[in-house]
Amino acid sequence: MAKKYIDTGKKDTRGGFGAGLYEAGKKDPRIVAMTADLIGSLKMDAFAKEFPDRFVQCGIAEANMIGAAAGLAVTGKIPFVGSFAEFVTGRVYDQIRQEVAYGHTNVKIASSHAGITLGEDGVFAFADCCRHYEGQGSFDLFLRQV
């Protein structure tokens, strides 16, 4: 049986991010949005539709996305990049350190799906602390929540 959720009337964090990004994009033409094949998961749809020339779909290539964002920032753009928390904290640490932090580039990094409650977008995005590698790992944890 599917878990029932109570509608509190509050916006979800990723919905707030998408709405805020869209509003900021209307005010500042330097803003560029980039994602690693997660436009729907991060609610970037409205920005991509309204500003297609300022939206970059990078595919499943978070490291390349961070490098491209740093390059855009050097040219005066303000890139907002988005991916799952597991990937922007673990998979791209070197790129963030070398290309964003050391260079003091103006790159904004947003992430979502930090816990284990958004299983509908895939359990592969769960943090390593929520996995075990002998069996099904994250999938086992997800099923226990249902």
Identify the function of each model-found stretch:
Residues M1-V146:
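Thiamine diphosphate
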